[in-house]
C-alpha cells in the first residue's frame, strides 16, 4: 500500500472508531453520517516529475466529542511509520459550530509529494477501502474527490438503499450480488437471485501469542466466519458447476476492514497456504493463490483470492469462470462485559494488522472447524439446489412429452389447430419448444421466489438454523414441485374445483380446473402481467363456452377438455395462482 493511501485509510479508521466510541451506541447500531476525502494535487515546485498533494479528511456533521489533537497524533503516528508529513487538525476553538458548507470542526489535513503513478494507485486503494467499509456500514457515506492540476473527478460511496442482511454477530452485510462481481462470465440468460445468502459459522475463540499478549484487554477475541456463493446458485442450471474462485474479506472490531491490500502484508501471510483452514479435496477442488488482483474494478476487492485449477495446473471445462465464487467474510471481534475504550480498540486493530497471521495460526484448530463448517453448509445447500433443478428438468420433460403425445395422436385437425394457435406455434415441433420454455421460465420464477428476502433480515449461526433452514427449504420445494408424476399431481387438482359433467374426465393431465379462453393463454404465460381480476372474469366466460361446446359435441368431450387444459397452461403454472 502506498503511503498516501495508508495514511488516509488509517485516519478514516481512527475517526470511525472515535465516532463509534464517543457516540456510546449499542453494539450493532449502525453509524449514520458522511465523511469527505479530498486530494488536491499540483505540480511540485521542488521535486521534478512529482505532485504536491494536499489531502483533507473532514466530517459533514459534528463527530461526537470532537478530537483531542495531541492524543490523536500520539495514537495515529505509530501506525504511519512511512509517512513523513505534517498532520494538522482544524482548530476547535470555535466549539462545534459549522460553517455555511456544513463542514464540522473535525478536519484533518496533511501534505505529501507523490509521482502521478503512485497517486493513481493510492486513489484506487482508497476507493476499495471505502467499498469494504460500506458493505458493513451501509448508512455511512463517503465523498471522494481528486483534483490533479485543476482537473476534478469525484465519486460518492454509499449503500444505504441496497438490500442488507443482519447477522447474529451484530454485523449488517450488504447482500446485493453486484457488489461482489464486476464483469461476470456466467450465462446471464439463466434466471438468478440478485442477492447472496450468507451462512454464519459459530464464533471461534482466538488466542493471542504470549509475545503479542500485552494488550491490556479484559475479554475474549473471536473470529466469526460468514460464507456465501455469488451469484446465488438458485439461479443456475441443473449442471453443478465447480466453484471458480474464493474471495476472503478480513474485518476487525466494529466491522472495520483490516489493512491488507496486498499479499505481502503480515496479516495475510497465513492464507498463502490455500488448504491451511479449508480442506478443498473433500469438494474435489484444487485452489491456488491469485496474485493478479485488478485494482481497477467496481466490485469489492478481497484481501485474499484463490482460483480453482485442475491438479495438473490446466484449466478444464469443469473448472472455469462460469461457476460461482465463494465469498468468505472473516469477522474478528472482541467480546467483553465492560465497555472497551477507544484506545484499546484502536490498539487491537493495530495488533491485528501486524500479527493476524500469528494469532490465527495459534488457534488453527478452532478457526479451521468454524470456517469449514460454514463452507460445508454452503456446499451442501449448493448440491441440494442443483439436484432440485435436475428434478425440475426431468418433470418438465415428462409434462411436455405427455401433452405432445396427446397433440400428435389426435385425429381432429381443429383440435391441433387450436392448440398451435394457443401458443402461436407454426407446427408441433415449435409447439413443444415453446411449451417447454413456458414451463421452464415459470417454474424457475417459482423456484427463485423462495430465495427472496426482506430488505433487512436476521441471520443466526449455522448451528442454530441449519436443520430448520434445510427442513423449510425441502418443505417449500415439495409444495411447489412434488417429485411425483404429472398425472399423479393433476389427479389432486379437482380439489380446487372442477366441473362435473356426469362422465369420467381425462386422467392424462387430470381433470379440468378453472378455465380461461384460448386467446388468453399467450398473455397469461407472461408470468404476472395479467391481473387476478381479469383472469377471474376470463375463467368464468371460458367455463360457460366449454359447457356449450361439450353439449354440442359429446364425442369430442375428451379433446375439449384438452383444449381447456392447453388454454389454461400458463394459469396452472403462474406463480400467483397458488399464492
Curated annotation (Swiss-Prot):
In males, expressed in testis but not in other tissues. Expressed in testis from 8 days postpartum (dpp) onward, with a peak of expression around 12 to 14 dpp, at the beginning of meiotic prophase. In females, expressed in embryonic ovaries when oocytes proceed through meiotic prophase. It is found in: Chromosome. The keyword 4Fe-4S does not apply. One of its GO terms (biological process) is meiotic DNA double-strand break formation. It holds the Pfam family DUF4554. Residues 501-528 have a biased composition (Basic and acidic residues). Keywords: Chromosome, Meiosis. Residues 480-554 are annotated as: Disordered. Disruption phenotype: Male mice develop normally and reach adulthood but have smaller testes. Spermatogonia are present at the periphery of tubules but are strongly depleted and spermatids are absent, due to defects during meiotic prophase. One of its GO terms (molecular function) is DNA topoisomerase type II (double strand cut, ATP-hydrolyzing) activity. GO terms for cellular component: chromosome. Residues 538-554 have a biased composition (Low complexity). Component of a topoisomerase 6 complex specifically required for meiotic recombination. Together with SPO11, mediates DNA cleavage that forms the double-strand breaks (DSB) that initiate meiotic recombination. The complex promotes relaxation of negative and positive supercoiled DNA and DNA decatenation through cleavage and ligation cycles. Despite a weak sequence similarity, retains most of the structural features of the ancestral archaeal Top6B subunit (AC O05207), including the transducer domain that interacts with the SPO11 subunit and the ATP-binding fold, also named GHKL fold. Heterotetramer of SPO11 and 2 TOP6BL chains. Interacts with SPO11. Belongs to the TOP6B-like family. This is Type 2 DNA topoisomerase 6 subunit B-like. It comes from Mus musculus.
Amino acid at each position: 500500500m502506498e503511503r498516501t493511501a495508508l495514511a488516509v485509510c488509517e485516519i478514516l479508521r481512527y475517526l470511525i472508531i472515535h465516532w463509534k466510541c464517543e457516540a456510546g451506541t449499542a453494539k450493532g447500531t449502525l453509524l449514520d453520517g458522511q465523511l469527505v476525502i479530498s486530494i488536491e494535487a499540483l505540480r511540485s515546485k521542488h521535486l521534478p516529475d512529482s505532485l504536491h498533494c494536499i489531502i483533507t479528511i473532514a466530517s459533514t456533521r459534528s463527530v461526537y466529542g470532537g478530537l483531542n489533537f495531541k492524543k490523536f497524533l500520539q495514537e495515529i503516528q505509530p501506525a504511519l511509520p512511512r509517512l513523513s508529513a505534517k498532520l494538522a487538525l482544524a482548530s476547535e476553538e470555535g466549539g462545534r459550530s459549522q460553517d455555511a458548507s456544513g463542514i464540522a470542526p473535525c478536519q484533518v489535513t496533511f501534505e505529501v509529494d507523490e509521482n502521478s503513478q503512485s497517486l493513481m494507485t493510492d486513489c484506487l486503494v482508497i476507493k476499495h477501502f471505502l467499498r469494504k467499509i460500506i458493505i458493513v456500514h451501509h448508512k455511512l457515506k463517503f465523498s471522494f474527490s481528486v483534483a490533479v492540476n485543476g482537473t476534478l473527478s469525484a465519486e460518492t460511496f454509499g449503500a444505504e438503499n441496497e438490500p442488507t442482511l443482519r447477522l447474529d454477530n451484530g454485523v449488517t452485510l450488504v447482500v446485493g450480488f453486484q457488489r461482489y462481481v464486476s464483469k461476470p462470465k456466467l450465462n446471464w440468460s439463466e434466471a438468478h437471485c440478485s442477492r447472496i445468502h450468507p451462512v454464519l459459522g459459530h464464533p471461534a475463540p482466538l488466542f493471542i501469542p504470549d509475545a503479542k499478549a500485552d494488550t491490556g484487554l479484559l475479554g475474549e477475541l473471536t473470529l466469526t466466519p460468514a460464507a456465501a456463493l455469488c451469484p446465488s446458485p438458485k439461479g443456475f442450471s441443473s449442471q453443478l458447476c465447480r466453484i471458480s474462485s474464493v474471495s476472503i474479506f478480513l474485518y476487525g472490531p466494529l466491522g472495520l476492514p483490516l489493512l491488507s491490500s496486498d499479499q505481502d502484508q503480515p496479516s495475510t501471510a497465513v492464507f498463502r497456504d490455500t488448504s491451511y483452514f479449508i480442506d478443498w479435496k473433500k469438494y474435489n477442488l484444487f485452489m491456488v493463490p491469485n496474485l493478479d488482483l485488478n485494482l481497477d474494478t467496481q466490485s469489492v476487492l478481497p484481501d485474499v483470492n484463490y482460483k480453482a485449477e485442475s491438479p495438473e495446473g490446466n484449466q478444464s471445462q469443469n473448472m472455469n469462470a462460469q461457476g460461482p465464487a465463494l465469498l468468505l467474510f472473516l469477522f474478528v471481534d472482541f467480546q467483553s462485559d465492560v465497555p472497551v475504550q477507544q484506545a484499546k480498540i484502536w490498539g487491537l486493530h493495530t495488533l491485528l494488522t501486524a500479527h493476524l497471521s500469528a494469532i490465527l495460526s495459534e488457534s488453527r484448530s478452532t478457526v479451521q472447524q468454524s470456517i469449514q463448517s460454514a463452507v460445508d453448509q454452503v456446499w451442501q445447500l449448493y448440491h441440494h439446489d442443483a439436484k432440485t433443478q435436475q428434478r425440475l428438468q426431468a418433470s418438465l420433460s415428462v409434462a411436455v412429452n405427455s401433452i405432445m403425445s396427446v397433440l400428435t395422436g389426435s385425429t381432429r385437425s381443429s383440435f391441433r389447430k387450436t392448440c398451435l394457435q394457443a401458443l402461436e406455434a407454426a407446427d408441433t415441433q415449435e409447439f413443444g419448444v415453446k411449451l417447454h420454455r413456458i414451463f421452464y421460465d415459470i417454474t424457475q420464477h417459482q423456484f427463485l421466489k423462495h430465495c427472496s428476502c426482506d430488505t433487512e433480515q436476521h441471520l443466526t449461526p449455522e448451528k442454530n438454523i441449519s436443520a430448520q433452514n434445510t427442513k423449510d427449504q425441502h418443505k417449500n420445494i415439495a409444495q411447489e414441485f412434488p417429485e411425483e408424476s404429472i398425472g399423479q399431481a393433476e389427479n389432486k387438482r379437482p380439489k380446487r374445483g372442477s366441473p362435473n359433467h356426469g362422465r369420467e374426465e381425462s386422467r392424462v393431465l387430470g381433470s379440468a380446473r378453472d378455465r380461461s379462453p384460448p386467446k388468453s393463454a399467450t398473455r397469461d404465460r407472461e408470468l404476472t402481467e395479467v391481473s387476478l381480476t381479469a383472469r377471474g372474469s376470463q375463467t368464468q366466460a371460458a367455463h360457460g363456452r366449454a359447457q356449450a361446446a361439450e353439449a354440442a359435441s359429446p364425442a369430442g368431450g375428451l379433446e375439449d377438455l384438452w383444449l381447456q387444459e392447453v388454454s389454461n397452461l400458463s394459469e396452472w403454472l403462474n406463480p400467483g395462482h397458488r399464492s
